[in-house]
Amino acid sequence: MQPPPRKGNYVKFLKNLHTEQVAKLQLKNQHECDLLEDIRQFTIKRSAVEKSYSESLLKISSQYLNKKIPNIPDIKMEGMEERWNMWSVWRTVLEENEKLARARLAAIEVFQQQIADEAKVLRDYKLAIAKRSLAGIVNVQKELHLSVGDVDKTKKSYFDEEHCAHDVRDKARDIEEKLKKKKGSFFQSITSLQKNSARVTSRKELLEEKSSGARNDYVLSLAAANAHQNRYFTVDLQTTMTTMENYVFERVAEYLMLMGRTELLTCSATQNSFGKIRDQAQQLTREYNLQCCYLFYPVLKQHIQYDFEACDNDPVRKVTAEHESAAETLTKEAKNLAGRVVKENASIRENAKKLALCQSLRDSGQRTDPNDPNGPDLDTKIEEFRDQIRRSETEKTKAEACLQCLRDGGINVDEWVQEAENMGVQELTRSASSISMRTDASGQGENPSSDSFYDSDKEETQAAAQTKPKQEQQLSRDRTFSDSEDEPEVRPSAAAASSAAAASSSMMASSAGGWDDPTEVNWGAGEEEDDKDEPIVPEPKEAIFKCTALYSYTAQNPDELTIVENEQLEVVGEGDGDGWLRARNYRGEEGYVPHNYLDIDQETAGSAFNGTSGNQLRSQISFSSVDYTVDNEDQTVDSMQSPDQVSVIMAPQKRVKSDVEWCIALYDYDATAEDELTFEEGDKIKIITKTAHGVDDGWWEGELDGKFGNFPSLVVEECDEMGEPLSEGGDESPPPTAAPTFALPPAPALPPEYAHELELELTEDMFGSQDTADEDSGYIPNGAAAPSIPPPVLIQEPGMEDDLSDDGQPPPSLPPPQLAKAGGSAPGSGSKVEKGAAAGGANTLNLGMAQIIVTAATPMVEDGADKSFPPVGESDAQPVEPVSKEQPAEVAKKPDIAPKPLAKVAPQSAPAKEGNAGVRPVVSITLTEYPSCDAEDQQSFSEGTDSASVADVPVLQDAEDPFNEKAKGESGDGSGFEANFEANFDANFDDAFAGIGGGGGGGGGGGEQSNELDINGEAAGEAIVSGSAAGDEDIEAPKQVVGGRASIPEELDSNQLAHYHEHEIYYVDYSHGQL
């Protein structure tokens, strides 16, 4: 056959070639079957002429010698051992039988039993299997036609685009030459030439970009087609030929060897003749016979490969990413191809396992699968699995060829391949689902749609229909290889969602009486238990405790459970340890749910899970636990906080890092080399080094049971000496039952008349107007308090356990904090703090700092790392109200004392719940006492406060220097505070304070400052600090804003966003006339 033409349709030529190949394969099989039939008939007829052996054998031998035998020549080369194909040997057999016809009387019976019968069975099987094999190769050829058809399409498009681009390039070159010569025609000026040059240049760039894209498509389709051709020739065609042969060469050789051996035993007279037949038959091999067949049928040896055909001397021969759009498209293509390779590898492994299982069942005598007796037989299943493996291998080969093509073009495909392989390893612990919710122990993950639910009144078949897996779609070449978009998220109707929410609300109301208050935990008992060294008690498997669903979740796998927001559930197990728990609903259905979707009942959990294992489970679903890092580390959020119940936020006990590192095995691993370790899941390994080969290639060196070796880091997880996994920040989670303590400075001793008055007013503001809130709509009128006031959030830093006694009260040396009125009442009501005399004649003008704590519900997931705070356009929706003259709160100013550091609070993620309308933040102010000031400062303060006019106080702008670098250099006492502040809030200062109406500033001669905090859409309070100190500079204390909009999920609608913007946590530090 001639090679494919350089010009023309590839598909047409390929179809003709494949048709001829199928015909020759069928002819080859027919020849083999004819040969088997000839051997069988020959043996039978020899047996029939036993009595007249000599005469009849001579006649028969001559008959078959005269028959037209395929003249497949032998390969004869100088210096090469003489060899024969099976047709030549058969011809030798006939010739020798013609001479030795009389010696075959004794061997007729042996021939009849061992040759004739088996040859008939083999021939019938070959005829039957040839039909299936030829049908299969035709289907494979059709797939190859599609791939080559893509080459024709992309080639045509490339030639068209390149022709256009080439013409425009020539035209642009002519215009540029005319411009260089500055010579126009009689009817054309230089200006018109310049305009034409600009127009033609822009058109040239556009057409070159199109030509480049068409060339890239052509190169990619060419690579895929060539890879498919390689696969077809080396695998599909060879497999079909082997299947059709069914060891016919070996069987024929066996038959002929048997003939020769029998004849030698029966007749010494024929020893020489049949010795020759035997020797030739022993040299029969499939390889040599195929070589002879290839020589006789050259079309079977024709292997087609396509080369890139450049258009108009195009110098580019590979994929290029010269243009931005091409680079982006090729990068996306590389990512999709890498994902397809990993996917096809997984499919090959899975189908190979199924194929091995079916083959073992067939070898054991089974005809059908015992697990599927009504299904197809094992042979059909085996063929299906083989075909699936073949398809997967073909797709994998094409994808790898395209990846290599992209790699040759300078595209970074190795990064995507590594990422796809890592994702494949990480997803081994869960069943395959592209939209299943996967979370870690910290509760961070993709927040599912808030309106996902199930209706308990519907039939179970509807729920099963929602989770039914979709059939895999066949993707074309120009589509993405990723199948993540083939499974859209199922969203029920709004009416069904509202009915389910109403049903769950009524169920919540009936069971709310049994909920525990997390603030009533016996902290003293918890401390005593922590001090004791108790043995680790394994968690009982049958422990059951109640919990509440914080969000709705639709099951994506058969082993998961669909839950509705506020639904009462029972947790019956810890799941597989990757952020899932096994729960049971009121209908008795059990399944896995994400643990951070649950709000656990602490009392029930405490009674059900005792000891260390209980604490571990409770820490997974704790109401709130916040990690704090001080030494320039990012703040992390470990879990979620229920908006209905506020728990104690604690700073964790920092882990004392050891010089020895440990890791625990997540999977079994068998060593593949002498320098590797073999271990099983759960083994604890001591890490020697993380750069086993001198570079960070993902292999670690460790010690297990006294044996040293290397192992992959992907199958292990770092842990401590006890085998407990380490958290992301390297610190252990704090014990959930630790008691809250205060770490604030001593409170000032206010005059009795003011202290009593402030306490009464604060109590009235917090609890006086609870019944006026609109619970149904979630709207809180001005001046109205929330229906329920959660306790304030308290802070505990490491080393502060000694600040409280066992009963939770401050020690005698630390006076209790005094309460001051917070700006939570209606406008027009306020309080004024004035100086007074303390007992013992000491100077009582010691107010230097005030701390405002607002506790409110905030969303659970912090996905607003790249959002501004507040969001764009929100500052206009909530304008800052002017300062009221009736709401000043004047405090003393001491310029020589820097503020002491406050305990810092990290943003606490809490779920977004629309049902908690009416929850309103609680504000508490703690006044901090500083050392007494002298008489001159008191006089200066008195004069400044009496003469200051609140009406003249301007609204502060955003601070340009929030950290007051100059003040940091002059203040020694405040250095610790600012170091801690910068470490925790420098990263998110711009996002946290962008758009807030209010600021701070200070000058050398003192000043007046104000700040308004917008809480629940109204002015919640103002803090105005005035003072005068000539020649002294004010030290501006940095501001802290914790929580708020930065962690609101993206899928909340506009009214939900407005609701959560009303619940913020602000910290304001007042010291020396600064906000």
Swiss-Prot record:
It is found in: Endomembrane system; Synapse; Cell projection, Axon; Presynaptic cell membrane. GO terms for cellular component: axon; cytoplasm; neuromuscular junction; presynaptic membrane; recycling endosome; synaptic vesicle. Residues 431-453 have a biased composition (Polar residues). Residues 11-289 form the F-BAR domain. Detected in larval body wall muscle. Detected at the neuromuscular junction, on motoneuron axons and axon terminals, at synaptic boutons in the periactive zone surrounding the synapse (at protein level). Detected on motoneuron axons and axon terminals, at synaptic boutons in the periactive zone surrounding the synapse. InterPro entries: AH/BAR_dom_sf (IPR027267), F_BAR (IPR031160), FCH_dom (IPR001060), FCHSD_SH3_1 (IPR035460), SH3-like_dom_sf (IPR036028), SH3_domain (IPR001452). Pfam families: FCH (PF00611), SH3_1 (PF00018). Keywords: Cell membrane, Cell projection, Cytoplasmic vesicle, Endosome, Lipid-binding, Membrane, Repeat, SH3 domain, Synapse. GO terms for biological process: membrane organization; negative regulation of synaptic assembly at neuromuscular junction; neuromuscular synaptic transmission; positive regulation of Arp2/3 complex-mediated actin nucleation; receptor recycling; regulation of actin filament polymerization; regulation of synaptic assembly at neuromuscular junction. GO terms for molecular function: phosphatidylinositol-3,4-bisphosphate binding; phosphatidylinositol-4,5-bisphosphate binding; phospholipid binding. In the autoinhibited state, the SH3 domains are bound to the concave surface of the F-BAR domain and prevent promiscuous membrane binding. This is Protein nervous wreck. The gene is nwk.
